[in-house]
Design a protein with these regions (language model features):
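Conserved Radical SAM active-site core
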Residues: 3-16, 30, 41, 45-142
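A generic secondary-structure signal marking the coil-to-beta-strand transition
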Residues: 7-8, 30-32, 202, 230
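S-adenosyl-L-methionine
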Residues: 13-14, 21-31, 37
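Short, flexible, solvent-exposed loop/turn segments with mixed acidic/basic and small polar residues
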Residues: 23, 52, 163-165
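Short, glycine/acidic-enriched capping/hinge loops at junctions between secondary-structure elements
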Residues: 24-27, 44-47, 247
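Short aromatic/hydrophobic contact patches that present stacked aromatics
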Residues: 33, 90-92, 172-174
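Conserved AdoMet/S-adenosylmethionine-binding subsite of the radical SAM
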Residues: 99-249
């Protein structure tokens, strides 16, 4: 029996909120974002007017929001988020790097399922450096949006076993593109690689590197043309286009 009064998670400053998925394969779908704090990477290259330190999820840096499962459930009830999930909104678990807390997350989702008598649709946003527990797919039918960091963003040591796993389960691979050289790197490391990743084009999404609506307008067409040339998917940053820099929308 899971003690929901004692088990905890660390959440970012924006906690949980309802919105539309803004990026990748599930773009436009109703989603309840659960943003966890803490990350195992330091992204140095994603610099824009809105993220000068290089991270596009800087709200996940705080580790002060330690909440019990009961506190999270109450917050979700107060915000109407449980009802959203019951009608098939996606539970988008993001960060930071959510797999850092996956032991607790497995308990949390199991407790949520028992308490409210349904299992939510789950999609993770992950950097692809930590192996997910097999239970996520086998028991919960979770999907994954993988966003590997390129040289532009600090290029952490590759984890081919993790990336091969995601390629095999047909995860969405989303790459932030800032220049043409990024595409050569993607093809060398992930498509025509010698480590067995060998991504298929239809599982790849190119997304512009930007932090505001104005920046998006400037660079999106170029990245879209790259996607056309390489026969891969293009993902805008829908939240920037609709709401610019606003949070919790």
């Amino acid at each position: 029996m899971i003690d929901t009064a004692k088990e905890t998670l660390f959440l970012s400053d924006d906690l949980l909120f309802y919105t539309l998925e803004g990026e990748g394969e599930l773009i436009g779908q109703p989603s309840v974002f659960m943003r966890l704090s803490m990350c195992n990477l330091t992204c140095i290259g994603f610099k824009s007017e809105d993220s000068p330190n290089g991270c596009d999820s800087y709200v996940s840096w705080s580790v002060k929001n330690k909440m019990t499962f009961d506190e999270i459930f109450q917050y979700m009830e107060d915000k109407g988020l449980i009802n959203r999930l019951k009608v098939e909104a996606v539970l988008k678990i993001t960060g930071g790097e959510p797999i850092l807390q996956q032991k607790q997350l497995l308990k949390f989702v199991e407790a949520l399922s028992e308490k409210y008598d349904f299992r939510p649709r789950i999609d993770f946003e992950t950097n692809g450096t930590l192996m997910p527990d097999l239970k996520w797919v086998d028991d919960f039918g979770a999907t994954f949006t993988v966003s590997p960091k390129l040289t532009t963003n600090g290029d952490p040591e590759s984890k081919p076993d993790v990336l091969c796993y995601h390629a095999n389960i047909q995860s969405c691979f989303k790459f932030v593109i800032s220049k043409a050289e990024d595409i050569d790197e993607i093809w060398r490391k992930y498509v025509e690689d010698d480590k067995g990743i060998n991504l298929e084009n239809y599982r790849i999404w190119f997304m512009p590197c930007c932090g505001s609506r104005e920046e998006h307008i400037k660079v999106a067409v170029t990245v879209a043309e790259y996607a056309k040339q390489m026969n891969v998917n293009f993902s805008p940053r829908l939240h920037l286009l609709l709401w610019d820099k606003a949070l919790l929308v």
